[in-house]
Amino acid sequence: MSLLATHVGSLPRGQAVVDFLFARERGEDYDPEAFDRCMTEAVSEVVRRQVEAGIDVVSDGETSKISYATYVKDRYTGFEGDSPRNAPADLKMFPTFLDRLAKQGGTPQYARPMCMGEVTSKGQGELQKDIANLKAAMATYGASHGFMNAASPGVISLFLQNGFYPTREAYLAALADAMRDEYRTIVEAGLDLQVDCPDLALSRHMLFTHLSDEEFVKVAESHVEALNHALDGLPEERVRVHICWGNYEGPHVCDIDMAKVLP
């Protein structure tokens, strides 16, 4: 039996892609048709390079997304303003290092609006473009197996915080209902779905630092319940989950043990 090679999803973008993404992010004028052409060409190139490198299960590199989680604000209603920013607990333990990171500007500043209204889909038009670009590139370069990323309800709630729903649980439920169609659309397109769930580990030392590990695990369980609701009816073999403790440069001395968050 051979092992298949794959990766987590997000891959480096070329400068033209970056310029378009941040023009859109900042609300600047840009040519939508040129944007779409740029994304199509960039996805083709990123798939070519994956195939050349021997990757068996390829992705679009999340090329058209400003971020693996906050892209949701552009495709769903209810988000405006700005969410509170909170540095991970391990970086707060080393304030000089945190200050140096901030001054280096190594992490781009993405908009992180709060949920201030009902979360509903604006339609799957942008997702359909992503799917079409990936499948066209796969056909061109002979890749037979592909996957596409989508944010989990929990990670959305981590970065786009709740200012509308009466409880955190109600917000998670609304996000799960809203994301169901996105998940289903990816699977029905013949791609595997990767649900990005850093909330199941990263949020322990980012948002829930006031809780004990045991209390956090209960929060994580509620996130899993919301995710399972959103995935209901999809074949298990077509879904994979990405959990991480954050890919930022830091000491990571506050990461919760894997044994506590994985069954």
Where are these regions (language model features)?
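Domain-level signal for soluble alpha/beta catalytic cores
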Residues: 1-263
